[in-house]
C-alpha cells in the first residue's frame, strides 16, 4: 500500500524508472526541491497496469514522462521542465524555507 504524503503540488507525474527522459525530469525536480507530489511508476509490479490505465484515461496514450496538471497531460521532458521553471520554482523556494523553519 502506498504511503500517503502531504502534497505540496497540484500535479501528478507518470514515469518509468529506466526512462532517461523521466530521470531527467525527476532529477530536475529533486535538484530544485520540487518534492511531495504524487508519482506513478507505470512498470510497478503491483500497480503498474492500474497506473498505465490511469495515464491512458487522462492523456489518450501511455507515454512517459507525463505530468498531469489541471486534468491535462503534458508530455516531453523539456516541456515539463520549462513549465516547472516558469511555474514552480518560486513556490519550491518558499516550501523549502518553511520546512527549514520548522526543523
Question: Where do the model's predicted regions map?
Answer:
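A short, hydrophobic beta-strand/beta-hairpin element that forms part of a small beta-sheet core
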Residues: 63-75
